[in-house]
Amino acid sequence: LVGSEMCIRDRLGTVLGSVAALLFVVFIFAIYMKVFKRQMKRERNVRVSSFGYTMKILVITVIPVLLSTTIYNISGIIDQGIFKQVALLQGYTQNDIDVWWGVYTGKYKLLINVPISIASAMAASFVPVLTGAYHRDDMEAVRGQINLSTRFIMVVAFPCAVGLAVFGLPIFNILFSSTRATNAEASLMMYVGAVAVVFYSLSTLSNGLLQGIDRLKVPVINAAISIVAHVIVLILLMLIFRLNIHAVVLANTFFALLMCFMNSMALKKYSGFKQEIKKTFIIPAISSLIMGVISYIVYFILYKACHIEIIAFILAAIIAVISYAVALLLLKGLTEDELRHFPKGTLIIKVAKKCHLL
């Protein structure tokens, strides 16, 4: 029952979110309709493309993007079918299977999708600049944009992954207080699979980057290969290691990792981009680990002192943000010029200089 309720909530949330987004887009379009019409009247000597040509370009552009997204989403359906059938063959009860799957989709996936969606939005913001540079045949600017966007995403993804792994149980207890019985299982999934945030964020970004340099089919092919490998890994983990729901968590992490690797190879092939490792991955990872240790110690002390989970977590989260920023700047993970590209970058630079971090 718990698992079924979580699945229903998960699906309902997705549908309502999509409907809300659609209504918002329609609302914005309706507001700007008069502006569009005025702009169209002012235009002179404009060649209007035929409806057939426009639809052809749209279909050629949209179908690879939709296919790539569909493969990402269909992996959940495939996972559910394989997991439930294999788990039944291994002797697990239907109730256990439903609860595990409900916790996986309704708690673990729900939470890791938050930072991944942020990465997806960031990826979309980088594509127009990248596409412009590519069509100007300015490959130096293309490589610079790929490097900047990758570093930007990793600076966000690593602390999110570590934070979710460290504070999985407190977060679940705060958000899902009515189903605390399954929060320990959810936090274990998060501890095992929080690193998927990094891989999914990077694979989502690299999909957008490849589409930005007119390699629309490449992410689709890579996603198809990854989903096949993912299924094989899932079956092996369940049959040989009997990891039950944790096999799904690990297989999904593998799927994203393989996507990252293949997309990275494709970016190198088509743009000549060579990935810098130290500042992009190592320093954010070390800074995030430092953040995780410090913030967990703070949380542990505060919780022992006040026994109020939400207060201990909020204060520890504030310390986490500060400690990560300090560690990242002290380790030279970001330069002043790179910080200017961040939201409120000028303010961050002023504060960092006052604290002698830059």
State where each predicted segment sits.
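Interfacial segments at transmembrane-helix termini and the short loops linking adjacent helices
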Residues: A165-V197
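Interfacial transmembrane-helix starts/ends
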Residues: M55, V59, T105, F126, ...
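Helix-loop junctions and terminal segments of transmembrane helices
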Residues: I116-D138
